[in-house]
From Swiss-Prot:
SUPFAM superfamilies: C-terminal domain of alpha and beta subunits of F1 ATP synthase (SSF47917), N-terminal domain of alpha and beta subunits of F1 ATP synthase (SSF50615), P-loop containing nucleoside triphosphate hydrolases (SSF52540). NCBIfam families: atpD (TIGR01039). It comes from the Eukaryota. ATP binds at G172, G173, A174, G175, V176, G177, K178, T179. Coiled coil: none annotated. The gene is atpB. It is a peripheral membrane protein. GO terms for cellular component: chloroplast thylakoid membrane; mitochondrion; proton-transporting ATP synthase complex. This is ATP synthase subunit beta, chloroplastic. It comes from Convallaria majalis. Belongs to the ATPase alpha/beta chains family. One of its GO terms (molecular function) is ATP hydrolysis activity.
Amino acid sequence: MRTNPTTSGPAVSTLDEKNLGRIAQIIGPVLDVVFPPGKMPNIYNALVVKGRDTVGQQINVTCEVQQLLGNNRVRAVAMSATDGLTRGMEVIDTGAPLSVPVGGATLGRIFNVLGEPVDNLGPVDTRTTSPIHRSGPAFIQLDTKFSIFETGIKVVDLLAPYRRGGKIGLFGGAGVGKTVLIMELINNIAKAHGGVSVFGGVGERTREGNDLYMEMKESGVINEKNIAESKVALVYGQMNEPPGARMRVGLTALTMAEYFRDVNEQDVLLFIDNIFRFVQAGSEVSALLGRMPSAVGYQPTLSTEMGSLQERITSTKEGSITSIQAVYVPADDLTDPAPATTFAHLDATTVLSRGLAAKGIYPAVDPLDSTSTMLQPGIVGEEHYETAQKVKQTLQRYKELQDIIAILGLDELSEEDRLTVARARKIERFLSQPFFVAEVFTGSPGKYVGLAETVRGFQLILSGELDSLPEQAFYLVGNIDEATAKAMNLEGEKK
C-alpha cells in the first residue's frame, strides 16, 4: 500500500530519475526492450512508453516485464494496443509493479486494468494505491472456521450454501438470469453484511459490461446522485483488449477487494466474469512469450497462474473475500484443462437452468445440479442438513415421475406419489422469490429471507401441514408466513 503525491509535478520529475531503455523489437503486444548494463528492471515491473506516432498522435503504453532475456534485454507484454510504436522509442522503468487506486473512492466507478477511470466522471478522489502483484495472506492470518455466508436467497442458502471466504462457480447460458442474480447478491451483501462488491469483467463483451452498468444504475446498486453511496466498483478488460490486459484485469479487481478486506475489515464479494477468459488470455501471452504449450494448447503454467489468483481470495481474521466466478465450459467438456483446473478451487457450484427460467421460476437455480461442500451436518447443523436432503429427495422423485405423468397423467399415480408431486411443486415454487433489483421490472417488493426462516418454511411444506394450500400461494413470496397469507387472499378472492 502506498500513497501517491497529490500533484502530478513531483510524480513526473521522479520518472526522470528512473532507468531508461529503448525498444529493440515489437511482435504484436510483446516488446523487447534494451536497458543499460546493471540497470535491468525486475520481473512484473511496469514500463511506460511515451511519445508520438508518425502522424503526431500522443502514445502512452504501459507494459509489464515478463522475462529477462540476457544481453540487457527484457521482454514485456503491453496492456494496451501497440499501434504506432517504433523501434528505438524511449521506455521508462517505473521501478514498481502496476498500481491501482483502492478504497471507498473506487465505489460506483468503472476502471480499466491500469486503474484508470473510463466512465468520464473525472479522476478518482484517492491518494492510496496498491500494487496488483502480492502474495496471498500468510498461513497464520487465515480464518479456518467454517461459516456460512448468508445470501438471503432461499434456494442458495438451503441447498448449496456459500462459504464465507469461499469460491463459487456460477454456470449458466445466456438469458437465464446470471446478471440479475449477481446484482441481487451485490445488493444483499451491502444490506445484510454492510459489505461492498467488486466486479471484474474479464474478457467479456463490451455490450454486456455496458448493460450491467446501466442496470446497476437503474436498480440503485450504483447511486448516480451520490456516487459515494454506491455498493460496487467495476473493473473491465473487454474482449477487444490485448491479452496482457485481459490476463491482469482479474488481479486489478482482486487488489481493490483485498483493500476492503484488510484495511476496512469488511466482507467483500468479488465477481469474476469470466474465469475461463483469464485462462485464455494467459494462454495467448504464453504463446507470445515462446513457451512450449501444454495439454490442449494451454500454457504450461496454467495451475500456477490459477493458483496465484485463487489463493489470494480467502478469509482472514480481519474480513473475507467471497468470490463468485462465472465459468464458461468450452464445448460442454468438463474435462477441458481450464474448467478442470477451476473446479479444484471451488467450494460450491450454482447451476442456472433454462428449463426453470422457461417456467418463470426465478432465480432459475437448479436445486439438484447445484452443489456445496458446506452442506454437511457438522457445519450447517443437523436440522438444516436433514431439511435440504428431504427437499432434494422430494424433487428427485418428482423428476423421476415426470415421464409417467406426461404419458398417463397424475390420476395413474399412487396416493403417496401424488402427495410427493404436490409437495414437490410447492417446493419448486417456494424456491422462487422476488428480488430487490427486479422491483423496477416486476412491481413486487424484493424479499431477503434469513436462513432460519428458510429452513422453517421448507420443514412446514415437507411435514404436510400446508398440503391444503394452493401451489400458486408459494410462488414469488419471501418466507412461509407470506405464502399462508397469500393463500388466504386467494381464498377470499374466490368467494
